[in-house]
Amino acid sequence: MLDRNPGSNLADLYRALPVTWASPTMSPYCDDEVKYAVVEHTIERFWTMRQEGLPIAGQKIIDLTTVNGVRVTVEDGTWGLVRASSNKPELVVVVESPVSGARRHAMFEAIDRILREHAEVGAYNQSL
């Protein structure tokens, strides 16, 4: 990177990076026997919301990526990810916003409301 920016030092390159508000990896308990079904339901809910033009976290869904779970992205670039852990009885939830901590929190709350439709989804190991 430095060789492509000969007039800059590492501190300059770091300062030029965009600011984002990212969550830690949050993992609610979910039994191995049901976690994949919970993720599939979450994918279906996001697809339905997108098809019906319903917002998530107050914004239009602009992209859904369904590789190994689901990543939902809204108009302002805020996104949330839900997937099943490959080696623990839990889900993995991550959210990030290029706009603000409030937008990150709104995405987390919206995803959590969908996950809470399943009684099998337990407490998070950490939260925002």
Residue ranges of predicted features:
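Phosphate-binding and adjacent anionic-ligand microenvironments
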Residues: M1-S86, E90-V94, V99-L128
